[in-house]
């Protein structure tokens, strides 16, 4: 279920403040954040944001196609290593 239109999109205020300060100074530094629920705004385009995935910060370079999505969508929390292929060959014998 999506967020109500009258509420508007969510963004962590500290993150928005850092982005606006960097845009005013024309700086491009990596910004660390734990706010995976923050929506990506057009002001963030061109910045690299390090999003926490539960154990480390994953750098996410924001492009125009990402606007409207959440930061957490681009920092995966689970590692998938694939299924074991050896079981298939041993069962056929």
Curated annotation (Swiss-Prot):
InterPro entries: Ribosomal_uS19 (IPR002222), Ribosomal_uS19_bac-type (IPR005732), Ribosomal_uS19_CS (IPR020934), Ribosomal_uS19_SF (IPR023575). This is Small ribosomal subunit protein uS19. Keywords: Ribonucleoprotein, Ribosomal protein, RNA-binding, rRNA-binding. It comes from the Bacteria. One of its GO terms (cellular component) is cytoplasm. Protein S19 forms a complex with S13 that binds strongly to the 16S ribosomal RNA. GO terms for biological process: ribosomal small subunit assembly; translation. Transmembrane segments: none annotated. Belongs to the universal ribosomal protein uS19 family. GO terms for molecular function: rRNA binding; structural constituent of ribosome. It comes from Alkaliphilus oremlandii (strain OhILAs) (Clostridium oremlandii (strain OhILAs)). PROSITE patterns: RIBOSOMAL_S19 (PS00323).
């Amino acid at each position: 279920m999506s967020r109500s239109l009258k509420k508007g999109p969510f963004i962590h205020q500290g993150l928005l403040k850092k982005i606006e300060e960097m845009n005013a100074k024309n700086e491009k530094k990596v910004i660390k954040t734990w706010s995976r629920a923050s929506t990506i705004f057009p002001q963030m385009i061109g910045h690299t944001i390090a999003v926490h995935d539960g154990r480390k910060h994953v750098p996410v370079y924001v492009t125009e196609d990402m606007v409207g999505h959440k930061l957490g969508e681009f920092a995966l929390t689970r590692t998938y290593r694939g299924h074991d292929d050896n079981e298939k060959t041993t069962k056929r014998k």
